[in-house]
Amino acid sequence: MKKIILIIFISINFISISFAKIVEEVKKVPVTVTNANGVSDSREIVVTIWREDSRVKSPYLFFNHGRQSHPALRKQFDRVRYSAQSKYWVQQGFVVIIPTRVGYGESGVDIDPEDSGSCKTISDFPGQVMPQVQQTKQVLEFALKQLTYVDTTQGILVGQSYGGLGAIKIASIADEIKGLKGVVNFSGGGHGRPTQLGQFGAGTSCDSKGLEKIFAEWSKNKVPTLWFYSSNDKFFGPSDPKDWHASFKNAGGTGEFINMPEWRNDGHGTIGDIPNWKPHFDKFLKITGVPFKEIAPPESIKTKPTGFARLDDISKVPSLGSNVNNQERRDRLEDMYKKFLLFPDPTNRAFLLHSSGSYWYWWGGVDAVQEVIDKCLAKYDTGCKLYAVNSDVVW
């Protein structure tokens, strides 16, 4: 049977989606991590699984997320889903496995085993990525033993940002990871400084030379690697990643560097640019020998201004469902919309209303529009409608 995922966008931006062939599951997996100082901790972490509902045995795609160093931001860390990418990879034939690691969101923030210190301290990148490596091994061991629909003989590991840094480390010990055939690094690195000015400047790592050294040390990769970086990466800039890859290659590493086009206002989220990385990703899969289905990438959700209202005219935000004739709920809706207007990045934010009166907003990350749509569709099958995207009302 041909497996499809159908997305229909009606002209007025109401969204109806059928995910009958794609299943999202949440598992709790016990892990033990040891940080760079030798301190150990054992607990359960949240793991998201994306798969086809037919439970056909499929190769795995293991995904490691990036990092937030501030405790408040780590606490706010949602369960990691990467829904647009995950659904695409499931369509390609993978079971997608995404742990939310110790130190983040639902997996517990009372400790931070990946603490990399400040720019004033000496970086210990090997010690700091070890908790990521440990959890990768343990979660994958769980998946290969407990999930009967996972092909234990072949899989790919993908990492984004700090997860990309760890991915290159894992490539150097791939013989310890069952079935691992290739590693993909999206925007990998550490100690990025997207907004701070000073000695190192904004948009660079404050330990770029340290990363050059460590990538050289990890160059004895046992499987092929693929590196994606965008020219407008606000964490690492356009030149540092090229130096890291050159250091890796000069020390004997094998892997292709893809210089991605600019991605919105911050190329650190270039993993969201599926149409542009897809050809390189597919070519890489052929090199690894892992079987996959060649399919078209999902189209970006397109929106356009409607002239319904000015963006800052809060009075025009519609009251729907339970918000009608309920001043208390109307006040809460307006308060949330005010927060949306205050978001610092006007090029990647979205506000969505549901016909029941529920609402969602999001800013930053890979794709704010996709995030609010996913949040709505996780609760409702229909009735989700975008109100504002970036600096425009699209209602």
Task: Briefly describe each language-model feature range.
Residues 21-55:
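N-terminal cap/lid segment of alpha/beta-hydrolase-fold proteins
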Residues 56-58, 66-108, 235:
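Short substrate-entry loop that stabilizes the transition state in hydrolases
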Residues 64-66, 229:
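The conserved beta1-alpha1 loop
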Residues 114-148:
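Alpha/beta-hydrolase active-site loop
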Residues 137-209:
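Primarily recognizes the serine-hydrolase "nucleophile elbow" in alpha/beta-hydrolase
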Residues 182, 188-251:
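The feature captures the conserved acid-bearing segment of alpha/beta-hydrolase catalytic domains
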Residues 250-306:
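C-terminal catalytic histidine-bearing segment of alpha/beta-hydrolase fold enzymes
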Residues 297-395:
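Secreted/extracellular ectodomain signature
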